[in-house]
Amino acid sequence: MKTDSAQVHRVERVDDIPVLLATLQRLKVAAILDRHFPSGHRWKGTLTFGEVACVWIAFITSQGDHRLCQLQPWAQDNLHTLRACLGKTVRPLDFHDDRLADMLDHLALDETWQDCEVDLNQHTVRVYHLDPHLFRVDTTTANSYVEVLSELGFFQFGHSKDRDDQPQIKVALATLDPLGMPVTTLVVPGNYADDPLYVPEIEKVQQAFGKGGKTFVCDCKAASLGTRAYLASTKDYYLCPLPQTQVSAEQRRDLLQPVWQGRQTLQQVYRPAADGETEELVAEGFSLDVPLQAEVAGQQVTWTERRWLVRSLAYALGQHQQLDRRLQKAQEHAARPKTSEVSTSRGQENLKNLKSLGRFRGFMIVGPMNPVFALRDFK
């Protein structure tokens, strides 16, 4: 009796490709891209612009490789998987790097891309039943070893927390909280200032989800009066720490005088605990309302800003321990025999200054920490 042995013609690792493509299909990414970036009569093959882009996104996500020249050989190795997921004939030539470069040129059209981004954001919110009312806006930098070839390029030298000696690009990003889903992205040269980037990002969020009733959580670089006034003019809310350029150290001391004199009641903040556990006290503070006015697009805008002065207990404890170490060191230094009256008086003056700092524990401005937060009043 003759039996036919099974023959293996091709072996492919499916990995996460079907999951990625199914997610993109659920979000209708291909259909949205095709609506805003039609393929045109010179487009060859059965796959559309959007379908090629979806395979490209799946490749970048799965392989962690953004190089154009690597997509075609990867598609060659996964032809059967791609055909099964897309339900169409797939050719390796559909993912040639020249075609991908042309697609990037189309995606770089700002107005068309912004319309596509709005369409995609609105559809994503509908599909996943998200609440688009709380957003977080922030900026960051990305360094590289590339050379700066022109003042018109994106990679430029600028202020960096990591490497000032390397060119960088600057990225502004708006995300939907608490999910952390990216909503809008803006890439600018690395020598741009951060402050002017917030309003354009906020405007793009408002273009997708409308104005009014949204809350934007930002860092202190978004605390410029112009940014806050713009949000007040659109009936939106904001929450951000105020830097010393907005509230000086002397103003903060004046605000804290009632606390030190025992005339200001502090509101306590507790961390929610599980059933049967005791809530943990993590902070305390107080608020005050400040009327503000500014000009936005030639119109006078007035609003009430609620400012919170907050004392984090963990942060205050760290300051307390650091101050005690410095006091002990200063006392030891002051107790040593001095060679002159000048050094003795200088050491005693330093010790006096350190002791006076004890009153500011927890409310001091050290590094990135800021005790004063501002938000547009919800009343």
List the predicted regions and their residue ranges.
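Anion-binding and metal-coordination hotspots
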Residues: 1-24, 34-379
